[in-house]
Amino acid sequence: MVKKSEFERGDIVLVGFDPASGHEQQGAGRPALVLSVQAFNQLGMTLVAPITQGGNFARYAGFSVPLHCEEGDVHGVVLVNQVRMMDLHARLAKRIGLAADEVVEEALLRLQAVVE
């Protein structure tokens, strides 16, 4: 039985990105923006984009979105070119904030440009 997800689109979570290889974002505990809707998240996997204070390549290439929070004190940019499907429960993620609606909308538009 799949555990109900408490994570919703727009949530900022603290989650481990290890293991990672190559150019993938890594880190034992880093913030990420939830992009998938709660109905999908209830299936056990969640689409997230890492948040960084670096990300120069992504900034110049148009793959990042400046982060503005409605809740929480997280700063940086959302790296849309580094999205990843994750089991947030298995990775013991916790909610640490909420992104502004315009941040989520812009991230989804940039993600759409990546996959089209």
UniProtKB/Swiss-Prot annotation:
<dbReference type="GO" id="GO:0006402">
    <property type="term" value="P:mRNA catabolic process"/>
</dbReference>
<dbReference type="GO" id="GO:0043488">
    <property type="term" value="P:regulation of mRNA stability"/>
</dbReference>
<dbReference type="GO" id="GO:0016891">
    <property type="term" value="F:RNA endonuclease activity, producing 5'-phosphomonoesters"/>
</dbReference>
<keyword id="KW-0378">Hydrolase</keyword>
<keyword id="KW-0694">RNA-binding</keyword>
<dbReference type="GO" id="GO:0016075">
    <property type="term" value="P:rRNA catabolic process"/>
</dbReference>
<dbReference type="Pfam" id="PF02452">
    <property type="entry name" value="PemK_toxin"/>
</dbReference>
<comment type="subunit">
    <text>Homodimer, interacts with ChpS, which inhibits the endoribonuclease activity.</text>
</comment>
<dbReference type="GO" id="GO:0030308">
    <property type="term" value="P:negative regulation of cell growth"/>
</dbReference>
<dbReference type="InterPro" id="IPR003477">
    <property type="entry name" value="PemK-like"/>
</dbReference>
<dbReference type="GO" id="GO:0003723">
    <property type="term" value="F:RNA binding"/>
</dbReference>
<dbReference type="GO" id="GO:0003677">
    <property type="term" value="F:DNA binding"/>
</dbReference>
<keyword id="KW-0238">DNA-binding</keyword>
<dbReference type="InterPro" id="IPR011067">
    <property type="entry name" value="Plasmid_toxin/cell-grow_inhib"/>
</dbReference>
<keyword id="KW-0255">Endonuclease</keyword>
<comment type="similarity">
    <text>Belongs to the PemK/MazF family.</text>
</comment>
<protein>
    <recommendedName>
        <fullName>Endoribonuclease toxin ChpB</fullName>
        <ecNumber>3.1.-.-</ecNumber>
    </recommendedName>
</protein>
<keyword id="KW-0540">Nuclease</keyword>
<dbReference type="GO" id="GO:0110001">
    <property type="term" value="C:toxin-antitoxin complex"/>
</dbReference>
<dbReference type="GO" id="GO:0006355">
    <property type="term" value="P:regulation of DNA-templated transcription"/>
</dbReference>
<comment type="function">
    <text>Toxic component of a type II toxin-antitoxin (TA) system. ChpB is a sequence-specific mRNA and (weak) tmRNA endoribonuclease that inhibits protein synthesis and induces bacterial stasis. Cleavage is independent of the ribosome. Cleavage occurs at ACY sequences where Y is not C. The endoribonuclease activity is not as strong as that of MazF. The endoribonuclease activity (a toxin) is inhibited by its labile cognate antitoxin ChpS. Toxicity results when the levels of ChpS decrease in the cell, leading to mRNA degradation.</text>
</comment>
<dbReference type="GO" id="GO:0044010">
    <property type="term" value="P:single-species biofilm formation"/>
</dbReference>
<dbReference type="GO" id="GO:0040008">
    <property type="term" value="P:regulation of growth"/>
</dbReference>
<dbReference type="GO" id="GO:0004521">
    <property type="term" value="F:RNA endonuclease activity"/>
</dbReference>
<keyword id="KW-1277">Toxin-antitoxin system</keyword>
